[in-house]
Regions:
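N-terminal metal-binding scaffold of metallo-dependent hydrolase/deaminase domains
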Residues: 9-56, 67
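Catalytic metal-binding/acid-base residues of hydrolase active sites
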Residues: 26, 79, 139
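Domain-wide signal for the mature, well-folded portions of proteins, strongly enriched
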Residues: 31-36, 45, 54, 64, ...
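Hydrophobic faces of well-ordered beta-strands that scaffold small-molecule active sites
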Residues: 74-76, 134-136, 159-163
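Alpha-helical scaffold segments that flank or form the walls of functional sites
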Residues: 87-157
Length: 163
């Protein structure tokens, strides 16, 4: 599994420079192929460096035997300012929902302190999820959008951010 997959599974894993994960690895090397392998994944500087059936010598092994390990997920459509009320009022039609929840909430992001706090929860939870890359919608407020980008970078997450 060499490639640009981020080796972010748990907080303790993210901060280590070189380590090996032991477990059951699931990936799709081709669109019609699901591959399941037992073994070891060597991770160096946050990137997957190679897969082996044996543990590399001299490298700490994090044992996740019985756990499924997958490459990070990519979210292609994510609205960061809507995070605080996701799942709210699911019975409303879209336009009603936008008018009652989205537009009033996004107006608060004109306040830099509000944006900083709101995005901190979003980024924290995104980092602790299986999502390692994303296309994220912010608000029309430039300073708030820059704050989101700053927080994503600080968390080590890769994203395209727009409004």
């Amino acid at each position: 599994m060499p490639g640009p997959y981020r080796a972010i599974l748990y907080k303790e894993v993210y901060y280590m420079n070189t380590f090996t994960l032991k477990g059951t690895f699931l990936d799709t090397p081709a669109p019609d192929t699901l591959r399941v392998r037992e073994g070891y994944l060597l991770c160096e500087n946050g990137l997957c460096a190679g897969f082996s059936e044996t543990a590399p010598a001299g490298v700490e092994v994090l044992d996740y035997t019985g756990k499924i390990i997958t490459p990070g997920l990519v979210d292609l459509h994510l609205h960061a300012p809507q995070y605080s009320y996701c799942g709210t009022a699911m019975d409303l039609e879209l336009l009603d929902w936008l008018q009652q929840y989205t537009y009033p909430e996004e107006a608060h992001y004109a306040d830099p302190a509000y944006a900083r706090l709101g995005y901190s929860y979003f980024v924290r939870d995104l980092k602790n999820s299986a999502t390692t890359r994303a296309c994220i919608f912010a608000t029309l407020h430039t300073d708030a959008t820059l704050e989101l980008m700053h927080q994503l970078r600080g968390a080590g997450l890769s994203a395209f951010v727009g409004k």
